[in-house]
A protein has these predicted regions:
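A noncatalytic interaction/capping subdomain that flanks phosphate/NTP-handling catalytic cores
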Residues: 1-136, 152-153, 164-326
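Conserved glycine(s) of the Walker
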Residues: 141-143
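Post-Walker A alpha-helix
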Residues: 146-147
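GT-A fold catalytic core of metal-dependent nucleotide-sugar glycosyltransferases
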Residues: 156-157
Length: 326
């Protein structure tokens, strides 16, 4: 028997087929560190259809070898998938983990089918001034520091991890992303105690620096889910504990700014990943897709709404510098 369902994230859709019901993604998703809710605002179950944007086929073969094949917009996994799910060392790098296959497949389909581009970034919205701050960077760059300090300063949450945009007839349009952030408990205790959850009680210093939690920040989200033509500030940070001062370097050269944007937009689509500690999955990127993304990167940095594109070198306390000045 074949079990079928579908998934929608923003406008993109994927049909799932599995030889085992136990392999299918389980709804509703939980708020936890490996959840796709730390990547996207909503992950919605929809009816299966042959006409969806992508297709994912899972064939559990207990005695077989793990294999992955991509043909067009159809991906097939076969092998001892149920056993791999149970024994993997890091469930984030699995079919449904927040660093895994479906996460990257959806980013690919959003670009390919809907021309929706996705920053690896947090987004904060100044509702009074109609200004969107996009803080772009990988793990350890300082996104969480900007996220929590921005909320503490009165900005509204637009996304914790993934910020989406598309050029539309009505103007440059931004789509709300994830509202849950994976944060190390030690960061909360040291820098943002006002956000500490009750579970921190009784934890040792070693424990709080080893453990991450999925912090639901939906209480601070912006009113609009879609923002059209906001004033835009794009920040590429490097935040270091113990560093003094605030150093901002505006990216005046549009070529360098566009490259920084392109590199960030490409990261999760282009990189290869190992699932279940043993199954390599190449990136989805190709020439036409990359060319369209580079064109979008130049269009973004040159757009009339772009107030500044800047790099920042600072510490958690001074990271905003004069960026919030109107």
């Amino acid at each position: 028997m074949i079990y079928k369902t579908g998934v929608r994230i923003l406008q993109a859709t994927v049909g799932l087929e599995s030889s085992s019901r136990a392999l299918l993604i389980r709804f509703p998703l939980k708020i936890e560190v490996p959840s796709l809710l730390t990547d996207f605002r909503t992950v919605v179950e929809i009816p299966f259809s042959e006409k969806l944007d992508g297709r994912l086929v899972l064939e559990n073969e207990p005695s077989g070898r793990a294999e992955y094949v991509l043909s067009g917009r159809k991906a097939v996994f076969r092998g001892p998938l149920l056993r791999l799910e149970k024994k993997t060392s890091d469930i984030r790098y699995s079919l449904w983990g927040n660093q895994g296959f479906l996460y990257r497949f959806f980013l690919y389909l959003l670009e390919l089918r809907h021309r929706i581009f996705s920053f690896h970034a947090c987004g904060l919205y100044d509702e009074g001034n109609h200004r969107l701050f996009v803080v772009a960077g990988g793990a350890g760059s300082g996104k969480t520091v900007y996220l929590l300090s921005g909320i503490a300063r009165g900005l509204k949450l637009f996304s914790t991890e993934t910020v989406h945009f598309r050029f539309e007839r009505k103007g440059l349009t931004w789509f709300k992303g994830s509202l849950v952030d994976n944060i190390r408990l030690g960061t909360l205790v040291r820098d943002f105690p006002q956000f500490c959850p009750s579970e921190i009680a009784g934890k040792s210093k070693d424990e709080i620096w080893q453990k991450k939690i999925a912090l639901d920040l939906a209480a601070f989200e912006s009113q609009p889910d879609v923002i059209v033509e906001p004033r835009l500030v794009l920040i590429f940070p490097r935040i270091e504990e113990g560093r003094r001062g605030f150093i901002a370097g505006r990216l005046e050269d549009k070529r360098k700014a566009a490259k920084s944007v392109f590199d960030n937009l490409s990261q999760k689509i282009a990189e290869s990943v190992v699932l279940y500690d043993q199954l390599p999955v190449p990136g989805f990127d190709d020439g036409p897709l990359a060319e369209a993304r580079l064109k979008a990167s130049f269009a973004l940095v040159g757009h009339k709404t772009m107030e500044k594109t800047t790099s920042v070198l600072s510490n958690p306390v001074e990271c905003w510098g004069n960026l919030l000045d109107d």
